[in-house]
Amino acid sequence: MEDFVRQCFNPMIVELAEKAMKEYGEDLKIETNKFAAICTHLEVCFMYSDFHFINEQGESIVVELDDPNALLKHRFEIIEGRDRTMAWTVVNSICNTTGAEKPKFLPDLYDYKENRFIEIGVTRREVHIYYLEKANKIKSENTHIHIFSFTGEEMATKADYTLDEESRARIKTRLFTIRQEMANRGLWDSFVSPKEAKKQLKKDLKSQEQCAGLPTKVSRRTSPALRILEPMWMDSNRTAALRASFLKCPKK
């Protein structure tokens, strides 16, 4: 699974996932499923944010081509992917600036158009079950919840999906691709079932020595959102519109 993750995801996403696991004292060599899940969640958060801006009139627009228009403001503030100290600093700054209620748990994004924090979920199970788990944990009407599954299903607070259909379709397509690539490599069952994961871990550890000398193919393209992981007060400097960068898993 670890090899798959390093081949399938952008190196910057992998690096952020490694830092997150290290921060919580988790070993990615052992918790390989969690490593894959964190990378997937990070990518969905970045794809959610990519290309969405607010124009002078306060309208939400989607821009995919390079554009030096300095009057565009990023619609979403990315909180996920930062270390906890910086993440809470960003959240506090948003609350002080916008008057938003401070969430009990760290959210993933802040939507400047709808003036609300967003919790993104990616699940291998039924979307409604995961949604209820998130809602019961957060217990706040001020945090919007949006859940995606690997089967193309989604669920959001009050059926408000925030993004346009095309943007959501990109996310669903990416998740479906990840699932298919895992299945092609015999990893999907272990990703879904902890029991199968233990068996797969043993196989991975045995194969690592055999594959140690092999070259690894990775995509070097960087998601636009990864280039803008900085405090929200620097948002005014992030004026260039962004180019699409949807990563594909290399074939065996």
From Swiss-Prot:
The keyword Iron-sulfur belongs to this UniProt entry's keyword annotation: no
Keywords: Decay of host mRNAs by virus, Eukaryotic host gene expression shutoff by virus, Host cytoplasm, Host gene expression shutoff by virus, Host mRNA suppression by virus, Host nucleus, Host-virus interaction
Record site: Important for efficient shutoff activity and nuclear localization: K195, K198, K199
Residues under site feature: Important for efficient shutoff activity: L28, L65, K202, K203, K206
InterPro entries per record: PA/PA-X (IPR001009), PA/PA-X_sf (IPR038372)
Major site of localization recorded for this protein: host cell
Any GO MF annotation of the entry: RNA binding
Assigned protein family: Belongs to the influenza viruses PA-X family.
Protein name from the UniProt record: Protein PA-X
UniProt source species: Influenza A virus (strain A/England/878/1969 H3N2)
Lineage: Viruses, Riboviria, Orthornavirae, Negarnaviricota, Polyploviricotina
